[in-house]
């Protein structure tokens, strides 16, 4: 509104005036649609320049809702096979590329025979989207990386309307995999892996330094066999980052799909953080492609042995609120990949 700044300054000259949330003292936001997650690490997600740099007021990535929510959005006949016209209508005219690029990335986990299978595989794509954005922010926090990143606002957390693109939770407030992988990426002490450099770093969000901590990395093949490992003692600065502590050297004969487990231990040997990744051997061939270890070559995940998990739970009440606390245990030596806990009532 013309004259708004002058009027506000006249009424209260002690307050600063911010005309909008982007392009006014901060750099522009976006993208919000699907890109190759490798571009987050490469810093090529936008044609308009660096994204995680300075203060970014708007940056995001999509995640498909759960199949239960998708069924609330449209008729079954349009859900599967995907009716592009209907999906695009429920995606702001195809704004987030859910029926195109997101679908292509999901198909890199193998073709789906049902909307249930597609929605499940699509959660892995959304998890990779969100986690890569946050861990790039971690790496570049306050100039510890190759950029100076002072802040990042994730746009947006949930769907304001019923649609085929969610974020951390959907229109029905159903959490997606993006929420849990965001929580992991933003834990106060966090060990993380860089898919572009193959390096391990540790991020600290505490106003306290930690000395003589140990970070470990283990690589497991598709048969859940440990094929590589390394550990190193580090000193972690207050509210800072220890970047590129060491490089993971993946064996040349490793299976096409494999897993990475990072752990961080304090001086008493207590585990204080852990992170899990899945990775393919596919080479990243540039920003105009959907290739790379985050993005393609995951079809072999279907060859993982099925695992029977053990579950136990307890219910309790605090005031007028009721809670269920569940514990999931994998009794086998096989990786139980991307397990979803669901309450059926």
Residue ranges, per PLM feature:
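Active-site neighborhood of glycoside hydrolase catalytic domains
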Residues: 1-27
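Acidic/polar loop patches that form or flank catalytic/metal-binding clefts of enzymes
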Residues: 12-21, 151, 191-194, 228, ...
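Substrate-binding clefts and catalytic carboxylate motifs of secreted carbohydrate-active enzymes
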Residues: 42-213, 218
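Short beta-strand elements of extracellular/lumenal beta-sandwich folds
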Residues: 197-202, 320-333
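Short acidic, flexible loop segments centered on an aromatic residue
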Residues: 206-224, 329-345
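Intrinsically disordered, low-complexity Pro/Gly/Ser/Thr-rich segments with frequent PxxP/GP/PP motifs
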Residues: 213-215, 221-255, 345
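Terminal connector regions
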Residues: 248-299
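Edge strands and adjacent loops of beta-rich recognition modules
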Residues: 284-322
């Amino acid at each position: 509104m013309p004259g708004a700044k002058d009027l506000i300054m006249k009424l209260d000259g002690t307050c600063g005036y911010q005309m909008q949330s982007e392009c006014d003292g901060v750099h522009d936001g976006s993208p919000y649609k699907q890109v190759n997650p490798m571009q987050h690490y490469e810093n090529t997600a936008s044609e308009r320049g660096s994204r995680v740099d300075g203060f970014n007021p708007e940056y995001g990535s999509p995640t498909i809702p759960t199949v239960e929510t998708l069924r609330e959005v449209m008729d079954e006949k349009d859900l599967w096979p995907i009716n592009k016209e209907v999906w695009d209508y429920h995606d702001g005219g195809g704004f987030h590329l859910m029926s195109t690029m997101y679908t292509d990335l999901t198909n890199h986990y193998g073709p789906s025979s049902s909307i249930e299978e597609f929605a499940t595989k699509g959660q892995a794509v959304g998890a990779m989207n969100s986690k890569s954005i946050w861990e790039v922010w971690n790496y570049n926090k306050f100039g510890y990386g190759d950029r100076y990143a002072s802040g990042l606002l994730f746009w947006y957390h949930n769907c304001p309307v019923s649609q085929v693109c969610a974020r951390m939770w959907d229109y029905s407030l159903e959490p997606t995999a993006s929420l849990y992988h965001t929580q992991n990426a933003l834990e106060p002490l966090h060990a993380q892996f860089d898919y572009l450099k193959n390096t391990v770093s540790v991020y600290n969000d505490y106003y306290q330094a930690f000395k003589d901590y140990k970070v470990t990395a283990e690589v497991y093949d598709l048969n859940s066999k440990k094929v590589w490992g390394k550990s190193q003692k580090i000193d972690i600065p207050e509210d800072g980052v220890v970047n590129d502590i060491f490089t993971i050297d993946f064996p040349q004969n490793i299976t096409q799909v494999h897993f990475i487990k990072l752990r961080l231990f304090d001086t008493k040997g207590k585990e204080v953080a852990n992170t899990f990744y899945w990775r393919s051997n596919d080479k990243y061939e540039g920003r105009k492609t959907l290739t790379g270890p985050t993005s393609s070559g995951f079809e072999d995940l279907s060859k993982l042995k099925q695992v029977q998990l053990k579950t136990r739970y307890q219910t309790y009440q605090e005031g007028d609120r009721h809670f269920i606390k569940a514990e999931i245990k994998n009794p086998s030596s096989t990786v139980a990949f991307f397990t979803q806990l669901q309450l059926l009532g």
